[in-house]
Design a protein with these regions (language model features):
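Minor-groove-contacting beta-hairpin "wing" of winged helix-turn-helix DNA-binding domains
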Residues: 65-73
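Long, low-complexity, charge-rich intrinsically disordered regions
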Residues: 1, 83-199
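Short alpha-helical segments that sit at the start of domains
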Residues: 1-18
Length: 199
């Protein structure tokens, strides 16, 4: 029988599997391949596959003993249809001293967006790190000196996971601006999304 249709959002592990599918640029993504790349237990991966299957956007099938996921949609269309299930990876945001920046952090927010589009960079540099690697108690809510502080986003998953440079990956970056009302940012996000999914 058909699995119940998904209402609500993907859990973050499913979102990562979805991103892996988008970035793999292949029609079929073998679950065993995904298991090698994603930092999940086998059980978490199985759940993520099941959740993708409940969306009608993916087909889960087997070739011999190898399970795979496949979508009938092109990447740009798939992303548009999946947007209702996707969430911003940003769990918390605050400020830290510039001296606290580590190599586990990558550019994110407006800083990363301005590197990849026509958007002018904001004065305060934004970084991201997985919430697992950073104690949120160390964030301050107040920006006192933009020359001495940076903005830090704590993400639900590692912003380096799909990154190809020193910034968070493009699609997660797009998702991190889900709640923006700034037209300049919306334009830049659209530009980045379009370019990334046309490839």
């Amino acid at each position: 029988k058909d699995p119940p249709k998904l209402t609500g959002k993907f859990v973050y592990s499913t979102q990562q599997l979805f991103l892996l599918y988008l970035y793999s640029k292949k029609k079929r993504l073998y679950i065993s391949e995904a298991g090698k790349v994603l930092p999940f237990t086998a059980m978490t991966l199985t759940r993520a596959v099941k959740q993708l299957e409940t969306t009608d956007l993916f087909l889960v099938a087997k070739e011999g003993v190898n399970k795979f996921i496949e979508s009938k949609y092109k990447r740009d269309e798939l992303f548009e249809k999946a947007k209702v299930y996707l969430t911003t990876p940003v769990r918390k945001t605050g400020y830290i001293d510039k001296t606290q920046v580590t190599e586990n952090m990558v550019f994110a927010g407006e800083t990363a967006l301005s590197e990849k589009t026509m958007l002018n960079p904001s004065r305060v540099v934004t970084y991201a790190i997985s919430e697992k690697y950073y104690d949120k108690a160390l964030l301050t809510d107040e920006l006192i000196d933009p020359d001495k502080q940076v903005r830090l986003e704590l993400w639900a998953y590692n912003p380096k996971q799909f990154s190809e440079d020193n910034s968070a990956d493009d699609i997660s970056l797009v998702l991190s601006f889900t709640d923006t009302n700034d037209e300049r940012i919306e334009e830049a996000v659209d530009e980045l999304q379009e370019r990334r999914l046309q490839e």
